[in-house]
A protein has these predicted regions:
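Short, charged low-complexity intrinsically disordered segments located at boundaries
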Residues: 12-17, 23, 98-100, 134-138
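Catalytic core of Fe(II)/2-oxoglutarate
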Residues: 42-137, 143
Length: 146
């Protein structure tokens, strides 16, 4: 066992992203996703992930998806034999001369009223946090590092 989650069904949503080149400053600063997992269909360059302390471009490969693990999954696997780290990433701003960028993003997040549990590889409980408390801490850290 690596960890667990208890509460309602959580939230999942599908986001159709459109980065309009008429607003060339659109982009996303470095961040990690709060939830469990994010699945992305990347159709144009611009997504970068942090590898060895440096941001690198994620290649656009037709028919392939990118998967980001989030902070909730990182939290529940912290004491396991195989910790799943949250992926720090960013989306570059576009220039007005770039083609319009589209993407499809699926987010799977725990219910804010739920509890995340941590277990070690032998199944012993190691800790827990309410999802709301964990997300509040992550938001505080993100705000302080702007």
């Amino acid at each position: 066992a690596s960890g667990g989650y208890s509460a309602g069904a959580g939230t999942t949503f599908l986001n159709f992203v459109h980065y309009d080149t008429r607003n060339p400053d659109q982009g996303l600063r470095p961040h990690t996703d709060y939830g469990l997992i994010t699945i992305l269909d990347i159709t144009a360059p611009g997504l970068q992930i942090k590898v060895n302390n440096k941001f690198e471009e994620v290649p656009v490969l037709p028919g392939h998806l990118a998967i980001h693990f989030g902070e909730a999954l990182n939290f529940i696997t912290t004491h396991s034999d195989r910790t799943v780290g949250a992926i720090e990433h960013l989306v570059l701003s576009q220039k007005s001369t770039d083609p319009v960028r589209h993407g499809i993003v699926y987010f799977a997040n725990p219910d804010l009223g739920g509890v995340l549990w941590q277990f070690d590889a032998q199944g012993r409980g190691k800790g827990s946090s309410s999802v709301a408390d964990l997300f509040a801490l992550l938001e505080k850290n993100l705000t302080e590092h702007r």
